[in-house]
Each structure stands twice: as structure tokens, then as C-alpha cells.
């Protein structure tokens, strides 16, 4: 009987022999040797088990004797016999692999609950994960020194160590090196494609290919079409306008200052073989993408700046939203008077934070003639208004129609210098002057187109309370055909005007219409009409010559406190209005680039 004991950190193999091997070696040499594996709890915590290996020839009683002896020494030990048959004379020596496997072997699950010695016989050529099979030759194991190097996380080396079957020379010391770890796939889901680690792209830390770099240049307005441009975008054909500059940019990207077009051209020719790029024959510095990329940014040469009219159509659907503001938030606009006497600059404070909008202010052409407020100002085709586009912060105000006002166009049709914004008219006149409020949702940067400094003159703002305006009636003479009145009906924001309004000859009239760009299904624009009686209009004509006329949206609350009416008031000559009004003076609004 030969006993081999390997401790947990052991590198020596002790083989005490009692001569039993020599007595029975001639009869049972070709028979089947067996290996008894007994996991024994180790006193050292670094390695899990110590192993006792016994090589014997008699299969009858020796297993039981050893098991009983081991059971006395350790009460919680479990005994396993793993036996294999040697197949032929060419059986290999697996002593080192068996010793390594024994150090890592745990007790079989079928034997964990049993404390009695159990003998398990494993038939030949059957391999189960519960047992370790090792064929040990008695003539080889006698003088073998086993050195075991183990790691708990590393797999066992299953390759056999070939030995000559008829060699009876003493074997020298063998060393088992650590097997290199196998590369674990980043995604272990069974897919062989995902397990392949991708090759590092374009050197150290750079993840942009040359063809991707050229595609980025084609989508950059700073380089396209200055250095590179599309010749046929739908076919993916582009041209290097400045090949030297493109190669310098590529060298700067790759951190290679000596990059030139010849070096970059070799990389481009590499893409010919890959099927990414192709050289257009007959044209110099012209290449083509074989597969045109999608979702690229198109840079046009003659792309002009987006005009406000184009932006107005895009943002038209966003302009109809309700905004609840206080009465102090007013939309003010006035005609720009050149050379006015009351042009002292003041800053007008804003009540709330405004929204960037565009205000169109149309000023009349001056012919030098002064007219009184009671005279009729006919519309002349030659008097083309001058429009100044000013970008400034204006508050958003709700009108009586419930629409959002973001741009105001004020046009004066009379040609007199310093003449009132609203003039008198007679029933026989073709049309009356109107002030139009347009809903033009336009967003522009805060700068004027021509860079002019636009200064609005101080204006007198007339506020007509809702309770007084509702009681105001339009008086008509008995010889006229009809009459009209202003009524505030329905919802608090509804203002209705009854037409036609017939008035006497020479009476100043203020008429305001509010057309707007509205979606289908909305209420049509309503017209607010009011009567201005001006008995002293002639005497006050020169005094009010330089007063700037103002358009204002006023939100008033009724006496009962539950109704709020928004009015649009245009004031011509404040002293000529006979209605019960209150007058206050506002500061000027200064807009500059």
C-alpha cells in the first residue's frame, strides 16, 4: 500500500510503502489501480482542503479501513472513492493534474448530508462533474515529487502529460506553470459576433476616421464650401477645393503637423479597397461616397439670412395663446417724428418682462403743408409710407379679440407735417383713416436693419374707462339716415360696434379696425368706432401740431369688479375730445442697435 498525502500548501509527496506493492505487483500490475479522494478540512484558511491520496491494489477492505480511520480523526469528513480502469498500456500519467484537482475539489452534493463512509464506484469512460478521475501507475508514483501551484479563480489545465509506458527511470521534479487567462468576451450572450473585441480606431484615443472627418467638414459652414464642397450631393460626389488646407486640418486633428495631401491621399486610396470612397475619373480632387450617408446637414453657398416674413409663417400657429397681464402692461407705438420740438430723450420703464418682437412703424412723407385737424386728408397714391423695422422688447398684450399682439403697424395717411394721426372726414369722403393692428409673430435679434437710432417722442395717452365708454352714445342729427352706438356686451373682452355710423359734416371721427391673421373658425375682426367732437379743434391746431399720436391697449376693470374690458384707444388731439376721459403723460421709448 502506498499513501500520498498532500497538504493545502504542499509541494512534497510522501510515499511510505509497506511492501504490499512488491508482493502483489506481479499479479495485479495490469489490473485497475484506484484513487481514494478524501476532502479533509484544513487548519489553514488560505486553501480550502487538504487531500490524502492512497494508491492501493486491493479493492475489498482497504477503503473501509481508511474511511473508518479518517472518520475518527475528523468527525465531519466525507469519503469518496473515485475509481477508473486503465485502458491500455498507453495510459498517461495524470498525477500533477489530479493533485491540483483534489485541492479544488469539493464534496459531492449527494454525500453532503451523510456522515457515514460511502463507497462510490465510477465505471470506466464515464465522466461526471461531481468526481475527479485520475489513473495512477504504481511504478511511476513511487518516486514522484509533486509541486502544486493553485489559484481558486483559475481553471484547471486538463491537458495530459505524456510519459513513456515502459520507462522505469526515476522521474525528475516537474513544475506546472500558471495557465494564462482566457479572454472573456465583453458580452456573453452566446453571440460570436458580439464577443469579438473591436479594434482600436485611429490610434490613441481618436475615434474619427478620415472619411468621417471629411463628412464633418462638408457639414460645417466654416469649411464648406471654402475648403471642401459638394458637386453632386445626391450622388455623394464632393471636391477638395483647398486640398492643402484640408490636409492641414486633418493633421491638426491627428496631432501630426507634417501632414500633407500625399499622406492623406494614401489613406483615401485605402478606402477605395474598402468600398467606402471612389475616385471620380477625369476630375482632380473629386471623390465620391459609395454609400451616401443619411441625415446630413446641407450647407448652401447662396443661403441667405432667414427673413422675418419666413419666420412669421413658421410661428403663426404659436401666436394664438392667452396671456393674462395687468393693466400696466401696454403695447405702445407712435410715429417717429423727425425734427420734433418735444424730442427730449427719456427712458420708458417697462412694467413686466417683455418678449422679443418686431414693431413696424410707418411714418408719412412730408410735403411741408400744414393742415388743421378738421380738414379732410385724402389718401394719395404717391404718399408711400416709409417703414422702419425696429427690434425691441415689447410686452405681450391681449386685445379684445383674444389674440396675441406681437407687431404693430401704424400708418398715417395724411401728408401734413405734424398733422394729427386721425383726421376728420365727411360722409362724402371715399374712406376714413384707419389704424391697423396686425398679428405678425416674428422673432428677430435685437438690432435694427439700418442701424438707426429710433427715438419715440413723448406722447399723451388717453385712457377711457370701461364704464364711461359703455355709456357714450354717438349723437346724430335728425336729417341723417342712421345712427350708431358703442356697446359692451357678452363676455368681458367683447367690444361690438354697430355700423353704419352717420355723423355731421366736419365732425372729427376716430375709427379703429383690428384685422389679424387668424386661423379658420375664429371670430372675424371687430371694429371699434368712437365719435370725437372738436369745437375748439381749429384754435388748438397749432398748439397740438407737434403732439405725437399714440396707440394704446388698455385693460380696465368695471365698477362691479367682475368684468374686465380691453380697449384699443387712438388719440388725435387730446383737448378736442368731449368724452369723459383721463389724461396722463408717458415717457418716451428709446430703441437703438
From Swiss-Prot:
Gene Ontology cellular-component annotations: cytosol; nuclear body
Molecular function as annotated in GO: DNA-binding transcription factor activity, RNA polymerase II-specific; sequence-specific double-stranded DNA binding
Which residue spans does the record list as DNA-binding?
A: 208-290
Question: SUPFAM superfamilies this protein is in?
Answer: Winged helix' DNA-binding domain
Compartments, as annotated in UniProt: Nucleus
Coiled-coil ranges from the UniProt annotation: none
Q: Give the compositionally biased regions (Basic residues).
A: 171-181
Q: What is its main location?
A: nucleus
Renumbered to this chain, the Polar residues biased-composition regions fall at: 182-191
The record's family statement is:
Belongs to the ETS family.
Q: Indicate the quaternary assembly.
A: Interacts with LIM domains of LMO2. Interacts via its N-terminal region with RUNX1.
Its biological function?
Probably transcriptionally activates the LYN and BLK promoters and acts synergistically with RUNX1 to transactivate the BLK promoter.
Q: Mind telling me what this protein is named?
A: ETS-related transcription factor Elf-2
Q: What is the lineage of its organism?
A: Eukaryota, Metazoa, Chordata, Craniata, Vertebrata
Amino acid at each position: 500500500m502506498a499513501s500520498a498525502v498532500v497538504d493545502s500548501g504542499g509541494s512534497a509527496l510522501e510515499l511510505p510503502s509497506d511492501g504490499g506493492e512488491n508482493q502483489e505487483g506481479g499479479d495485479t500490475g495490469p489490473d485497475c489501480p484506484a484513487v481514494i479522494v478524501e476532502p479533509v478540512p484544513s487548519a489553514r484558511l488560505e486553501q480550502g482542503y487538504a487531500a490524502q491520496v492512497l494508491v492501493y491494489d486491493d479493492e475489498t477492505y482497504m477503503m473501509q479501513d481508511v474511511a473508518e480511520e479518517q472518520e475518527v480523526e475528523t468527525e465531519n469528513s466525507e469519503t469518496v472513492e473515485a475509481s477508473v480502469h486503465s485502458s491500455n498500456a498507453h495510459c498517461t500519467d495524470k498525477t500533477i493534474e489530479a493533485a491540483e484537482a483534489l485541492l479544488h475539489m469539493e464534496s459531492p452534493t449527494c454525500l453532503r448530508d451523510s456522515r457515514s463512509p460511502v463507497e462510490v464506484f465510477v465505471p470506466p469512460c464515464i465522466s461526471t462533474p461531481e468526481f475527479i478521475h485520475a489513473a495512477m501507475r504504481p511504478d511511476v508514483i513511487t518516486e514522484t515529487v509533486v509541486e502544486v501551484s493553485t489559484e481558486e479563480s483559475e481553471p484547471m489545465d486538463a491537458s495530459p502529460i505524456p510519459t513513456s509506458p515502459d520507462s522505469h527511470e526515476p522521474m525528475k521534479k516537474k513544475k506546472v506553470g500558471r495557465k494564462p487567462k482566457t479572454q472573456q468576451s465583453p458580452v456573453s450572450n452566446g453571440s460570436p459576433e458580439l464577443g469579438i473585441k473591436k479594434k482600436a480606431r485611429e490610434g490613441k484615443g481618436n475615434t474619427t476616421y478620415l472619411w468621417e472627418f471629411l463628412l464633418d467638414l462638408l457639414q460645417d459652414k466654416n469649411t464648406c464650401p471654402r475648403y471642401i464642397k459638394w458637386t453632386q450631393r445626391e450622388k455623394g460626389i464632393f471636391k477638395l477645393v483647398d486640398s492643402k488646407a484640408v490636409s492641414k486640418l486633418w493633421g491638426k486633428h491627428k496631432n501630426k503637423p507634417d501632414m500633407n495631401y500625399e499622406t492623406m491621399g494614401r489613406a483615401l486610396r485605402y478606402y477605395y479597397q474598402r468600398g467606402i470612397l471612389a475616385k471620380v475619373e477625369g476630375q482632380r480632387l473629386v471623390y465620391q461616397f459609395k454609400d451616401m450617408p443619411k441625415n446630413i446637414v446641407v450647407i448652401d453657398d447662396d443661403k441667405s439670412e432667414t427673413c422675418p416674413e419666413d419666420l412669421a409663417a413658421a410661428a403663426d400657429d404659436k401666436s394664438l395663446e392667452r396671456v393674462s397681464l395687468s393693466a400696466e402692461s401696454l403695447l405702445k407705438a407712435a410715429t417717429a417724428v423727425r425734427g420734433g420740438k418735444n424730442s427730449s430723450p427719456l427712458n420708458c420703464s417697462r412694467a413686466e418682462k417683455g418678449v422679443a418682437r418686431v414693431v413696424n412703424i410707418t411714418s408719412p412723407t412730408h410735403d411741408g403743408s400744414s393742415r388743421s385737424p378738421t380738414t379732410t386728408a385724402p389718401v394719395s397714391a404717391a404718399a408711400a409710407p416709409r417703414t422702419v423695422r425696429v427690434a425691441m422688447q415689447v410686452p405681450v398684450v391681449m386685445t379684445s379679440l383674444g389674440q396675441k399682439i406681437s407687431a404693430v403697424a401704424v400708418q398715417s395717411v395724411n401728408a401734413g407735417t405734424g398733422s394729427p394721426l386721425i383726421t376728420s372726414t365727411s360722409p362724402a369722403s371715399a374712406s376714413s383713416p384707419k389704424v391697423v393692428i396686425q398679428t405678425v409673430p416674428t422673432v428677430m435679434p435685437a438690432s435694427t436693419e439700418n442701424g438707426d437710432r429710433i427715438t419715440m417722442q413723448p406722447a399723451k395717452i388717453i385712457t377711457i374707462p370701461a364704464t364711461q365708454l359703455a355709456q357714450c352714445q354717438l349723437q346724430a342729427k335728425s336729417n341723417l339716415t342712421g345712427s350708431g352706438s358703442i356697446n359692451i356686451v357678452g363676455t368681458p373682452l367683447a367690444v361690438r360696434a354697430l355700423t353704419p355710423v352717420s355723423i355731421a359734416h366736419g365732425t372729427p371721427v376716430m375709427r379703429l379696425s383690428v384685422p389679424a391673421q387668424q386661423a379658420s373658425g375664429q371670430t372675424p375682426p371687430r371694429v371699434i368706432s368712437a365719435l370725437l367732437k372738436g369745437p375748439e379743434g381749429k384754435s388748438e391746431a397749432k398748439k397740438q401740431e407737434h403732439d405725437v399720436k399714440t396707440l394704446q391697449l388698455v385693460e380696465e376693470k368695471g365698477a362691479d369688479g367682475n368684468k374686465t374690458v380691453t380697449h384699443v384707444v387712438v388719440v388725435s388731439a387730446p383737448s378736442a375730445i368731449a368724452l369723459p376721459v383721463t389724461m396722463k403723460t408717458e415717457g418716451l421709448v428709446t430703441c437703438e442697435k
